[in-house]
Amino acid sequence: MTELQLNPFSNPLFEAVQMSRIFPDGKTFVDCRPKQSYEKILEAFHTENKKPGFDLKQFVLNHFDLPVPHSVHYRSDTTKPVAANIESLWDVLTRKPDKENGSLIPLPFPYVVPGGRFGEIYYWDSYFTMLGLKTSGRYDMIENMIGNFSYLIDQLGYIPNGNRTYFIGRSQPPFYAQMIKLLADKKG
């Protein structure tokens, strides 16, 4: 990854978008996927934002794909017990392996996110998710998620808070060994 890919949020475009509040929250823009390289987008911004009638939101829509919610149509079934609802959520909250694009650091295996809005895995949240997966007998997914954390260790030297470039500067309490133990208890 280039320096700009690792930290695409230290530039005039990012500052303009976040300060203008064209999106309802600060997460939307940082999770957008660029349609071309950051360098080309910043070059276009530098040229276009000086023109009369420049529309920042339209510029962003022209140069980025907005994040798409994954589970918009999911509704829990209040007639089912809580455990049955949780079982039905695993597939809703599962994300497929990623391609490198935007702030999302690609992972090689499927993983479970903490909620429908999220497209990224979170470190210590994942341990508690794995406890639920263990109860559901989903050791395949536990193994996938451990594989992803192992991949992050190989790539970065540690496990960041989540697999977004804006999480690279921080981590969470160490749960990797406990994750491995969950799988070792089953597989030996």
Provide a role label for each language-model segment.
Residues 1-188:
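Acidic, mature catalytic/reactive cores of soluble proteins
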